[in-house]
């Protein structure tokens, strides 16, 4: 199998959401309408239930590290989601990535479509995880890239407009990989492991930019991203504009996330749940659409290297036994690329 996501599986072709939105529809097409949203239990946004905030500078400061490590461990155990502040990623790198992302999605459809996904592939501009003609669809378009390792990049999908996009993505992905390696090293420490046990395998980086198109209130209820847990190891997300919409599932209720300016929203993925033998759990989340304006976000997914086996780490199975299967990453990638976003359905396949 090719290592650049060609041949691992891809979505069935569906019409581009930007094209559909340009038709000024009076109603959302039926495949995008989610009647179940009317019955969902959503925590009011002014409620005190908020995800933890972790300060990376304190984790790295000997004076505060002990307390912050305990707080970090609690966030991973009880939430699987947290906001990361004082992360060390240069503000100018983040802001330039935001600007270039906005500029890319503002391009005419014809220009963006030059970077469209190929059949049976994940990379590029389009949609993902469409596996049947009947499933409900997300009211969003995405642009998906492999950024690390460098030799696995397929530059066919890397835009040349805006002209700075490639250089910006290079700098951004490099800095975020450093942060992810630091966090996974701290996770390993909290689990009683050597830091490289988690940092060494998670060196593949995928970047996905999402544009959730606005929907007029008369169009009915839809979702920009279906409820799911990330199939990857660790995700770092930054919101590009001021439009909120990320919800996480906590105690069977949907909790809206209020991003802190300049912070990354970080979440544990299925791979770390498997490797930790369920000590740290991935969390179901979704994105809702706004009635007035599009929502833009950039997610950096940190995944195992090709040739890696995914399974519970031996030092973490002694007390409670093995809870998950061990499989080759390539096989896992094929599974994750050919399943619709549906809660934790992929992880359920991995349980013993």
Swiss-Prot record:
Fe2OG dioxygenase domain: residues covered: 200-304
Pfam families: 2OG-FeII_Oxy, DIOX_N
Cofactor: Fe cation
Oligomer status and interactors: Monomer.
Record family assignment: Belongs to the iron/ascorbate-dependent oxidoreductase family.
Cofactor-binding details, from the entry: Binds 1 Fe cation per subunit.
Catalysed conversion reaction: (4-hydroxyphenyl)acetaldehyde + dopamine = (S)-norcoclaurine + H2O
Role noted for this protein: Involved in the biosynthesis of the common precursor of all benzylisoquinoline alkaloids such as morphine, sanguinarine, codeine or berberine. Condenses dopamine and phenylacetaldehyde, 3,4-dihydrophenylacetaldehyde or 4-hydroxyphenylacetaldehyde.
Gene designation per UniProt: NCS1
Name of protein: S-norcoclaurine synthase 1
């Amino acid at each position: 199998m090719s290592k650049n996501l060609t041949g691992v599986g891809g979505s069935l072709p569906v019409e581009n959401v930007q094209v559909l939105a340009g038709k000024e529809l009076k109603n959302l097409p039926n495949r995008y309408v989610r009647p179940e949203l009317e019955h969902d239990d959503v925590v009011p946004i002014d409620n005190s239930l908020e995800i933890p905030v972790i300060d990376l500078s304190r984790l790295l400061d000997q004076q505060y590290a002990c307390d912050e490590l305990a707080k970090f461990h609690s966030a991973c155990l009880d939430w699987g989601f947290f906001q990361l502040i004082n992360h060390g990623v240069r503000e100018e790198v983040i802001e330039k990535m935001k600007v270039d992302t906005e500029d890319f999605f503002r391009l005419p459809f014809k220009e963006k479509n030059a970077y469209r996904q190929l059949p049976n592939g994940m990379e590029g501009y389009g949609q993902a995880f469409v596996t049947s003609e009947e499933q409900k669809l997300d009211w969003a378009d995405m642009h998906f890239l492999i950024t690390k390792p460098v030799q696995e990049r397929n530059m066919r999908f890397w835009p040349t407009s805006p002209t700075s996009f490639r250089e910006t993505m290079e700098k951004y992905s490099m800095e975020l990989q450093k942060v992810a390696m630091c966090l996974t090293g701290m996770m390993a420490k909290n689990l009683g492991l050597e830091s490289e046990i988690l940092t060494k395998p998670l060196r593949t980086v995928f970047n996905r930019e999402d544009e959730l198109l606005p929907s007029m209130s008369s169009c009915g209820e839809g979702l920009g991203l279906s409820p799911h847990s990330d199939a990857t190891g660790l995700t770092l997300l930054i919101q590009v504009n001021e439009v909120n919409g990320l919800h996480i599932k906590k105690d069977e209720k949907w909790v809206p996330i209020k991003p802190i300016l300049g912070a990354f929203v970080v979440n544990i993925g299925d791979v770390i749940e498997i490797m930790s033998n369920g000590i740290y759990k991935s969390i179901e989340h979704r994105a809702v659409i706004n009635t007035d304006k599009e929502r833009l976000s950039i997610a950096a997914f940190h995944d195992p290297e090709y040739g890696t086996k995914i399974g519970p780490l031996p030092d973490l199975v002694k007390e409670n036994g093995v809870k998950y299967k061990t499989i080759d990453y390539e096989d896992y990638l094929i599974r994750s690329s050919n399943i619709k976003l549906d809660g934790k359905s992929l992880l359920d396949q991995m349980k013993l």
